UniProtKB/Swiss-Prot annotation:
Subunit structure comment from the entry: Forms a heterotetramer with UvrA during the search for lesions. Interacts with UvrC in an incision complex.
Protein name: UvrABC system protein B
Record-listed ATP binding positions: 44-51
Example of a GO biological process term: SOS response
Length: 665
């Protein structure tokens, strides 16, 4: 068992000082946390620096913090930002370590059993181990995670009790160390030295911890005493440092000692016998035979190796839990007094709420047909109510908080002011009758000012027809939809900014996260047709596209004002009034964002995310054959570097770009 270091404090390193209403938001959130408030909401408009605000809160309250994002890409970006803000503290990354994952499943209609198949990303596995070991060693830890953090993980008490602690001068037999390493799932391999392995050379044992990627440990013995512990480069063997003490954490999160393993196996056998009786009494002889054969094989592997593929399905017995008890998760590795931040909570909370039911349905089929014991159902994600029980104090972060968050707290901390002084756009409603002719007049006004226009429609057909009609009128227009490939989409956006055309028509432009400061008008056609594309949140997000321009304006064409429209307009007007008052008080003149236009291939999936950029000196079709080959090699290198750096959005963009460029040859 190791002791957690609690004296470390968070230190925020930034050249920026809180500005606008950031200081007030920080102070209110900090007071809430220190005052013991269970839940708070940070309602921050796009572009107001919500991550910087949360970083200041973390520094002030000085609590271990878990930040949950709704996908790996966003988690990776937040991880990068927090690493920059807290270079001296432990900023960790915890997401699903599968590059590819096909869960175990059974389809009764075709009698098809699908075996679990997966590809584990070694780099992410290392980072997961780094996260759990940091949480057990120190207090100044920020873990950025995806929703996968609510899935079952090993017992943190067992995990910490299995830590092998080594000190210089400690009496220990070399073979005793080797046995201890094997017990915590390290593998001996004197040739292929990788994470989770060790090798032996006389009185020297070299250990490659699961949480590291470059430096291994060299433990030198003198008789039955540890004489020296050094850090070495795992590839070259070069000595990079020396230490007096080191803690070696298990190579897997599902680890248990021999005594617990035997007890777990006896419980598995008891459950197997009881389940076989049930299946045979129901005349399910095939299912009984299948279950007996599979389970006995797993038991034999656990006895001989201490591990088996799919051991997580027996986690209830390994952890000593009762039927129905929640599994251990990453949240159990945190001390009781931790801070939880839910980013983009209006998307993340529904994900957390829905995880359990989908997992349960698949596993129930495996149990019913004899592929797994009923205890496999307890290898699962947390239910929402179980997740809530783990929460000490929580901050929901969103520009458009969902109903769940609003039910949890009345404390809504607003962050409306942008550092640029830009306002939320003016919103106007006009009748649907004659909407196109009216829009054409507005477009001409914008073209005279060298500004651009977004038009959102409800259907792809309408977008195409409107594009054709505008072209007949001599307007320069293009349309954007999901069928357009990444490369073509980004070229369209670039051409819009360059003024090669003036109007971009789309169906769900907010999903593209388009950031074009030149856009001063957004026209929302058929705004009164209730649905996902015209919900309050979608409308607020769409209106936000015009908040990059000092003359930003939104026109909604509608014959009636729906509840969603009214709420979206009220919220936008409320924010605009706050921003105007602040600007007047501080003498700030809103200025359109000046953003360099490059010849580039880029994609930005949400408004708050940075653009992913690949620079091209000239159009691809104008390159020579050798230049094309060189470019593709360069992009492939950048793709691999981005993946290694966990910048998955960049890597995915580069992958798509490479495929499209190859197809364009």
């Amino acid at each position: 068992m190791i002791e957690r270091e609690t004296s470390n404090t968070f230190h925020l390193a930034s050249k920026y000082e809180p500005a606008g209403d950031q200081p007030a938001a920080i102070a209110e959130l900090v007071d809430g946390v220190k005052g013991g408030e269970k839940a708070q909401i940070l309602l921050g408009a796009t572009g107001t620096g919500k991550t910087f605000t949360i970083s200041n809160v973390i520094q002030e309250v000085n609590k271990p913090t878990l930040v949950i994002a709704h996908n790996k890409t966003l988690a990776g970006q937040l991880y990068g930002e927090f690493k920059e803000f807290f270079p001296d503290n432990a900023v960790e990354y915890f997401v699903s370590y599968y590059d590819y994952y096909q869960p175990e499943a059974y389809v009764p209609s075709s009698d098809t059993y699908i075996e679990k198949d997966s590809s584990i990303n070694d780099e992410i596995d290392k980072l997961r181990h780094s996260a759990t070991s940091s949480l057990l060693e120190r207090n100044d830890v920020i873990v950025v995670a995806s929703v996968s953090c609510i899935f079952g993980l090993g017992d943190p008490r067992e995990y910490s009790q299995q830590v092998v602690s080594l000190r210089v001068g400690m009496e220990m037999d070399r073979n005793e160390l080797l046995k201890s390493l094997v017990d915590i799932q390290f593998e001996r391999n004197d040739i292929d030295f990788q994470r989770g392995r060790f090798r032996v050379r006389g009185d020297v044992v070299e250990i490659f911890p699961a949480s590291r990627d470059e430096h291994a440990l060299r433990v030198e013995f003198f008789g039955d005493e540890i004489d020296r512990i050094r850090e070495v480069d795992a590839l070259t063997g070069e000595i990079v440092g020396e230490t007096e003490h080191v803690a070696i954490f298990p190579a897997t999160h599902f680890v248990t000692n021999e005594e617990h393993m035997e007890h777990a196996i006896s419980q598995i056998q008891e459950e197997l016998e009881a389940r076989l009786k049930v299946l045979r009494s129901e005349n399910k002889l095939l299912e009984a035979q299948r279950l007996e054969q599979r389970t006995n094989y797993d038991i034999e592997m656990m006895r001989e190796m201490g591990y088996t593929s799919g051991i997580e399905n027996y986690s209830r017995h390994m952890d000593g839990r009762q039927e129905g008890e929640p599994p251990y998760t990453l949240l159990d590795f945190f001390p009781d007094d931790f801070l939880l931040v839910i980013d983009e909570s209006h998307v993340t909370m529904p994900q957390i709420r829905g995880m359990y039911n989908g997992d349960r349905a698949r596993k129930q089929m495996l149990v019913d047909y004899g592929f797994r014991l009923p205890s496999a159902l307890d290898n699962r994600p947390l239910r929402l109510e179980e997740f809530e029980q783990h929460v000490n104090q929580i901050v929901y972060v969103s520009a458009t908080p969902g109903p769940y968050e609003m039910e949890q707290t009345e404390t809504v901390v607003q962050q409306i002011i942008r550092p640029t002084g830009l306002l939320d756009p003016e919103v106007e409603i006009r009748p649907i009758m004659g909407q196109i002719d009216d829009l054409v007049g507005e477009i001409h006004e914008r073209i005279e000012k060298d500004q651009r226009v977004f038009v959102t429609t409800l259907t792809k057909k309408m977008a195409e027809d409107l594009t054709d009609y505008f072209k007949e009128l001599g307007l320069k227009v293009k349309y954007l939809h999901s069928d357009i490939k990444t490369l073509e989409r980004t070229e369209i956006i670039r051409d819009l900014r360059l003024g090669e055309f003036d109007i971009l028509i789309g169906i769900n432009l907010l999903r593209e996260g388009i950031d074009v400061p030149e856009v001063s008008l957004i026209a929302i056609l058929d705004a009164d047709k209730e649905g996902f594309l015209r919900s309050e949140r979608s409308l607020v997000q769409t209106m936000g596209r015009a908040a990059r321009n000092a003359e930003g304006k939104v026109i909604m064409y509608a014959d009636k004002i729906t509840d969603s429209m009214q709420r979206a307009m009220d919220e936008t007007a409320r924010r605009r009034a706050i921003q105007e008052a602040y600007n007047e008080e501080h003498g700030i003149e809103p200025k359109t964002i000046i953003k360099e236009i490059r010849d580039l291939i880029s994609i930005s999936k949400t408004a708050d995310k940075d653009e992913t950029v690949v620079q091209l000196d000239k159009s691809y079709k104008d390159l020579s054959r050798q230049e094309k080959a060189d470019l593709l090699m360069k992009l492939e290198r950048e793709m691999k570097d981005a993946a290694k750096a966990l910048d998955f959005e960049t890597a995915a963009t580069l992958r798509d770009t490479i495929l499209e460029l190859k197809a364009a040859k």
